[in-house]
From Swiss-Prot:
InterPro entries associated with the record: VP8_pox_nuc-bd (IPR007586)
Main localization, broad class: virion
Any one GO molecular function term: structural molecule activity
Short name of any one Pfam family annotated for the protein: Pox_VP8_L4R
PTM per Swiss-Prot/TrEMBL: Undergoes morphogenesis-associated proteolysis which cleaves the 28 kDa to a 25-kDa product. Proteolytic cleavage of major core proteins P4a (OPG136), P4b (OPG129), and VP8 (OPG098), which occurs at a late stage of core formation, is required for production of infectious mature virions (MV).
Superkingdom of origin: Viruses
Organism encoding this protein: Monkeypox virus
Gene that this polypeptide is encoded by: OPG098
Protein name: Core protein VP8
Propeptide boundaries: 1-32
Keyword entries, A-Z: Host cytoplasm, Late protein, Virion
Amino acid sequence: MSLLLENLIEEDTIFFAGSISEYDDLQMVIAGAKSKFPRSMLSIFNIVPRTMSKYELELIHNENITGAMFTTMYNIRNNLGLGDDKLTIEAIENYFLDPNNEVMPLIINNTDMTTVIPKKSGRRKNKNMVIFRQGSSPILCIFETRKKINIYKENMESVSTEYTPIGDNKALISKYAGINILNVYSPSTSMRLNAIYGFTNKNKLEKLSTNKELESYSSSPLQEPIRLNDFLGLLECVKKNIPLTDIPTKD
């Protein structure tokens, strides 16, 4: 199993983010397969943000963006190669906003993960799979733009035979297997880390404002795993208490 996800999910892949029904859909996956982006919980859903499109981009908003990313402290430490060094708030921000990252996929207010289909494991199908394992230290990171940014959508009625780069300093609302994700391009130039939250053993969130609080949280990992139903409840709680960007889309 990939070390990126070793402490993030169970031993087997537990979610299936939808089959590729058409060759064009396969091309769309390929269009982003080599992009550089910070790994997060969205990796569970096989979400690879695209950096190219064959559709005309249509401007729909110009506004400030607030979005969320779920991951684990282990995931960040492993990707940064920190070894025994302490993970700091600055390191977390640098990981997500590394200038080498071409795109950052964000969860927004109208991101609905209830449509995700659990993958069968053997002959059994567990509808309440583990999202964050016992012993892990999951965190929720809230990002916001420094200033207003153009938000686009793809005009599916205006298609080209060739893919073109989406470009920098913009955001694109995209749908991956029924999940609305907001991709921010060249995030290091437009985004900043606003807040970090940890998960308590009562499936609640606590704000981690200092490196001391972050270190204390990492020394008290989850005593019980967070399963799908609990995670969906946490996500709804986040949406109610944190003003994430809402971008209505038509199915």
